[in-house]
Each structure stands twice: as C-alpha cells, then as structure tokens.
Amino acid sequence: MKTPYEYMYNNTMDLTQRKLTREEWNSVEISVSKDEKDILQMIMKGYHDNSIIENKTPSLLSYLKIAHTPVMEQHIYQVYCKDIIEKQKKKASESYSINFIDPFTQTKNAPKTIKKADIVRLEQNDVSKIKELSDSLFEFILLSLTGKLLKYATADRHRWNYYYYTLYHCSKLHILHPNKGVLQYVNELLTYFEDHVDITSMIARSHDYIEKNQYVYKHADMKLYVHQKRLFSICKQSPQTPKLILYIAPTATGKTLSPIGLSEGHKIIFVCAARHVGVSLAKYAISMGKRIALAFGCETADDIRLHYFAAKEYTKDWRSGQIRKVDNSIGDKVEIMITDIRSYLCSMYYMAQFHPKENIITYWDEPTITMDYESHPCHEIIHRNWRENIIPNMVLSSATLPKMEEIQDVVQDFRGKFMGAEIHTITSHDCKKSIPIINPDGFVEMPHFVCNTYDKLTSCMNHCTSYLTILRYFDLYETARFVVYLIENPKYLRDERYHVSFYFTNLNDVTMEKIKQYYLQLLSHVKEESWPVLYQYFQQQREYRIHPNMKTQGTLTKGLSLDTSLSTFNGNTAPHVNIFQSVPMGSSPKDTQLRKMKSMQQLGTSRPQEKANPILKNNGIYVSTKDAYTLTDGPTIYIANDVEKIGRFCIQQAAIP
C-alpha cells in the first residue's frame, strides 16, 4: 500500500485515463471560498460585458448603506475624514507650501438636511468604531497612505517612493461611491510631489513597489484578463462560423476558468489529460450552480455521469426527499461536459445528441501535454480524437502551445474538415506574479546570466520576443537590477533611442510587464563588443536567492541530518542514492541512502564526536522546511539535476502526517 509521501510524489501529474474514485467525486461537492466565488461571478458577467470592473473594497457610503447624495457625501467627509485631513495639512504646511482647496462649497440650491432614515443609520454607527476600520474602508486606507507619504517625505526616500506609488495606484481603483473630498486631497498631494518622483528609483525597487505591494495586491480591481476578453469576443462573433482558437496565455492567469464564462452562451466540452484539472473545474462549476456532466475512463456513453444539477429525470428517496437515482442518458440540461482524452468521443456524440454542434465548443486543455515523448499511450488517443472530431468550434489552450506557423498541418486539416473555418490566435503575457527559476547553486537564472556569447544572447532574445509568455519566469528583482545598470551606463547601448524617458513617461508605465519588456529591448540592443564586459560584470554581481546550508556530512546540527542511512516510508525501505554526493563507481545505490530526521533535532552532549567530513554546500535543498521562507510571493521553479531524488527528499523532510 502506498504511503501519503509516495502517493503525493507519484501523482503530481496523473495522466491515467480511468474512472473517478469516490473521494474525487466527493471533492467536487466542496464549495469554494467567497473570494473565489466573487471571481467566478465576475468571469460569468464578463462574458456579457468584457469591460466589467469590480472592487470589493467598501467606501464609507457603501459600508454605511446610505444613498449617495451630495449632502450626505459632505456630511461623511466632515464627520469621519475632515479632522484627519486637517491634522495632516497642518503638518504638511510646516515643510511644504501646498495649495489645498476646500472640497465642498455650498451652493444656494444644495440640500441642507439629511433624511431621517439616513440619520437613523448614522446613529447606529459610532464614529470611533467606524474609524477603527482603517484597514478595510477605502477612505481610511487612502488617508493612512497620505499620512505615511508626508511622514517619510524627507526621512526615508525608499519608503516615500513606496507610499507614493501605492497611493497613486490606489487612488485610481474603481470603488463604489468614494468620497470626493478625500480623493481631492489625495490628488492635491500627488500633484504637488509629482516632480519629486524618480522613475529610475521606482524601477530599481519595483520588486517591492509592485510585486510585494500588499496594498495594491489586496485592494486591486477585479477584471478580465486581456486574453479572456478576446476569447469571449471571438466566440460570440459569427456563431455559425467554425472556429479554431489557439489560446496561449501564462499559467495561473485564468485559462482553466474561462470555460465557465463561455458556458454563459455556449455548451462546453472541456477536455483534459490531467484528471485533477478536470476535477478542479468541476468543483468551481458546481459552486456556481453550473450543470455539469463528467466522463472519465468511459468506454461508451453509458459511462457518462450527470451531476444532480444537470439531471432531468430521476427518482427520489420517499423518506428524505433527496435524489436517489439519476437517468444519465438524458443530457438536455448539461452546460459543461468535463472529460479526459480517452472519453472525448463518447462525450462529443453525447453532447451532439442534445445540442446543435454549432453551439458547442470543445475546450482542449494542454493538448501538447505528452508531445515531448517520442511515444506515449496518449498519442494514439489524441490522434483518433482529432481525426473523428465533429465539433466545429475548438479552443486549444496552453501556455506553451506552438504558434500557428509551426502547426500548419493541423490548421489546414481543420480547415479541410470545416469549410470556411476562422483561425484565431490569442497570445497574452499578462501576469501579476513572477515565477523565478532557481538553479541548484541557489542563484536565479536570467538570460544575462546564461548567455556567455553574443550569438547566444541574440538567439535567446529572438526566442523570448517571439514567446512573451516566458516573461513570467524572469525574476523582477534581477530584471530591475540589469535595467537600472544600463540606464546608468548607456555607453553599452547602440544609441540613445532606448533611454528610459522614452519608455516610462509616468507611473502608469511602471508595471511589471513594461519593465520586463524594456529589459528585452535593452538586451537586444547592447553593443556586440560590450557584451563580454557586461556578462562578466553580472557574473561577479550575482546574489544568492537561497543561501548555502554549510553542513558537515555525518554531523547532527540544528536542523536536518545529511548522513547516509535508510529512507523509510511507513516501515518500508525505499532505497535511493544519496542526493548530496555522487555514488562511487561500482557501488550500489543501497550503499548511500537518505534518512529523515526531526526538523529541529539537537546533538546530545553524550554522543561521541564523529569524524569530520568535507563540508557540503546544499543550496535550497530544504525548500520544504527551513529554506521555505525564501519562496515568497508565489511559486518558484527549482532546477535539480536529479528531480526524483530531490522530490522524494523534500516530501520526506516535510513530515506531512
């Protein structure tokens, strides 16, 4: 029997085409969180209006649930905000001559009284208690930022930049009924200090100001990604025209949730090779009340199972009133069919039986998932599915999907089968977080670190420019370091056309995406004779992202043991080679094995001193325990020479019960 460690390790990418287990069936019924539902609801609304922008951060008026009127807005300002603003203005006047204007000027026709119903609501909310909500109400968040902006204006330039950038972007959020008096005060400060902003300094610390900015990240607007807007627009156009859509967007930018939005106007067949992806989509869809069917490991259409929401005919338990048995042969109500690649043809004919083919979209997730193998059991299944497909609308979705010119045979085959078919390519490089690549030595990998010749650099830049989704894997900190160095040393560039002022005119331009694109521009226009100097300089300036763990093999220190021993899973020996040193020629893997130790084990004083061994440098090998603190702000890719051994060790050391 597999232990939890072995199960987790061996099932990270399960491509087995089999039926769902009882546990997997039960898992889809677990509702997702409210925040996730808000995002899903926005995606569904976005299908009908792709310009939708929502923000759940409450303003004072929306929190108090009071109608928005000019007199009420003025009253809110005077009761809750004016005293805070006046204190800040008084402090600012000691150092700056800012011209503040009274935000509310009474007119003759302005109403001067508040409705009794609104008075009752105001009386129910004590002023002191409202002001305690400074971390959640929009106006108080802005005033907190203005206070810190004034505080650090002369004391700490780095913090001042941080709060200016944060205030600038927070003031532009789409909040329901923000107080205009507070916004006017904020804009007056931003305008006054505008000339103090140094774009180069903003870029230099962009990893703090953008990627690690909890204010901007927590209170950000909810809106569709650009690639989702294009997908929805294309699918709504010319509904009778066949379409092949090549959908290329970075991982974790909502591609897998897009079918839920598409189901607002179409019937969806979602095809996935990895079962956990389909199970996850089923969970999200059911949480939003979508009517789904599941087809995993199906030999015939009789193996397809409907969720209760999609059931049309069924029998009930006469005692409990709950559904007892569903007639799975009737799929009139199915909105989303979720299937593995083995069951696609069964699902396709099943859906075509109840719905017009022109209104069905086959949404194929990761169609190239096994194509890096010379041969694979899935290859024949994929070929048969493509050959026998009768659905005229297909979306091929993957972050690494080949470009249209690289798969012309596929495109022409689709056009030959569906006359007049439109071919669309959606390419996006939207991302909110970077996924840095860290090598076994603990350093971040970037193009300017790995391209040791100008020819390699040119080839790398051509590839990155053609596949901008790769920008996701550029570490923002290292990107900014390189950019700032070339800004300060323009002699390495071919000409002055690439000066920072031509690319960044204001703070709206200082985004993660633009900084990384500017990085590509600079790298692409470095002088050929200057590249060896630049390459050597940055090799010497490399910084550890994960610092070495200097340990002596065979010695127990505070932390984890590196000595050779047996690695056991629930009492069963799992032999494998020690990951910290090479196996001598002629030796067996059993001679050098791992042992799991308690994560904070101390050396006993009575233990005899062991013979000192050479110090081993193990950068980040404890990513699942004591090195985990280095993996901040999202996922990280860790490159290992032997993935299996490192993976087993990390899972073992995690000590998951």
Question: Which functions belong to the PLM regions below?
Answer:
Residues 1-657:
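N-terminal helicase ATP-binding lobe
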